[in-house]
Amino acid sequence: MAEPVGKRGRLSRGSGAGRRPRAQRSPSRGTLDVVSVDLVSDSDEEIVEVTSARCAADEVEVAPSEPPGPVASRDDSDSDSEGADARPAGPPREPVRRRRRLVLDPGEAPLVPVYSGKVKSSLCLIPDDLSLLKLYPPGDEEEVELADSSGLYHEGSPSPGSPWKTKLRTKDKEEKKKTEILDLDNSPLSPPSPRTKSRKHTRALKKLSEVNKRLQDLRSCLSPEPPQGQEQQGQEDEVVLVEGPTLPETPRLFPLKIRCRADLVRLPLRMSEPLQSVVDHMATHLGVSPSRILLLFGETELSPTATPRTLKLGVADIIDCVVLASSPEATETSRQLQLRVQGKEKHQTLEVSLSRDSPLKTLMSHYEEAMGLSGRKLSFFFDGTKLSGRELPADLGMESGDLIEVWG
């Protein structure tokens, strides 16, 4: 398309030496590409790009390429014929015409409709949707205004006064107002202002400071005075012991319920008192030996050493009392008779235990030995009847406490 450009000018005269050979440049840098300018545009941004491209292309100067080889020297008075002889042989080269630089102002660019009527009818216009406002935040309006003042617009961004954007903005504002009105209607009470919150906060701080001050005053009153000659310790090291008045301990009585046969006995008892007191009380109440008293809680036999606290007894709990039958040892003991033997003198009295099946001769011999009257002839009488010593207490119907008289 383009050929290398010829010489740009002659060298200065005055020296007889020949011209210096210049370095040959590559044809790619020495050629100019044809730049087509689209005069039909619907935005000013494309015009600016074309202008900048043209300016960048003009800054690159194309250096002429000269054929290698020495060039004949020329005198100051050389003529046209001499200059023609000095040129190298070969076909003459046509100089490339330099194109005129075309600079278009944004205001001078003609506005030509790009689309025909059919194309406009088939275009899908931007819908009036509020979701598009997210793609066009409010901060971009300032950028659009700045671009409008400088005459540049972002590619693909709508114009500042586009009707669809203003319509979306107005719709968004209306919906926000509606939601705010609904929120105010739904809320029974408006939220407290930050001023009221700060007042509440200051009141709470004042109350806390008053409480702390009172506690410090109380601590200063209760803390003992430090002894003289000793350094006062820090507040953190102080230990205050407050001893209250010693009150006499009042034992708490626990009403224990005891069921025996058809009777229900209520016995006040301390929680730490053993159940032996219950056994003694029931033995006295029933007129039997304490060894024959058995306490049961449900089906569990209770030990006399246990306490209501260890057994975890409550007010509604009832203890059963059972009277056991007499044991064989008790039967034998009951068969023993306590008989009194009385002599002439008051001091000659002796109490002797004798079995019902034992003869009375044993009692007589025991009395003679105890009183030192062995060898003497003594007579023993029971209810006016003289005893020979071969009788049995059971045959005579004797009981414990009966009296036998001695004469001699």
From Swiss-Prot:
Q: Which GO terms describe its biological process?
A: positive regulation of transcription by RNA polymerase II; protein sumoylation
Q: Does the keyword Nucleus apply?
A: yes
Coiled-coil spans are 197-220
Q: Transmembrane residues, as ranges?
A: none
Report one GO cellular component. cytoplasm
Query: Residue ranges under compositional bias (Low complexity)?
Result: 24-40
Q: What broad class describes the main subcellular location of this protein? A: nucleus
Phosphoserine PTM positions: S41, S43, S73, S77, S79, S81, S116, S187, S190, S193, S209, S303, S358, S379
Q: Where is this region: Disordered?
A: 1-113, 141-205
- The UniProt regions of compositional bias labelled Basic and acidic residues, in chain numbering, are 169-181
Q: Briefly, what is this protein's role?
A: In T-helper 2 (Th2) cells, regulates the magnitude of NFAT-driven transcription of a specific subset of cytokine genes, including IL3, IL4, IL5 and IL13, but not IL2. Recruits PRMT1 to the IL4 promoter; this leads to enhancement of histone H4 'Arg-3'-methylation and facilitates subsequent histone acetylation at the IL4 locus, thus promotes robust cytokine expression. Down-regulates formation of poly-SUMO chains by UBE2I/UBC9.
Compartment list: Nucleus; Cytoplasm
Q: How is it modified after translation?
A: Methylation at the N-terminus by PRMT1 modulates interaction with the NFAT complex and results in augmented cytokine production.
The covalent link annotated as Glycyl lysine isopeptide (Lys-Gly) (interchain with G-Cter in SUMO2) occurs at: K118, K120
Query: Which protein, by its recorded name, is this?
Result: NFATC2-interacting protein
Q: Which domain of life is it from?
A: Eukaryota
| Ubiquitin-like domain segment(s) | 337-408
One Pfam family name from the record?
Rad60-SLD
Residues that bear Phosphothreonine: T305, T307
What gene is this protein translated from? Answer: NFATC2IP
Classification via PANTHER family: NFATC2-INTERACTING PROTEIN
Composition bias, Basic residues: 196-205
Task: Tell me how this protein assembles.
Answer: Interacts with NFATC2, TRAF1, TRAF2 and PRMT1. Interacts with UBE2I/UBC9.
Q: Which UniProt keywords apply?
A: Coiled coil, Cytoplasm, Isopeptide bond, Methylation, Nucleus, Phosphoprotein, Ubl conjugation
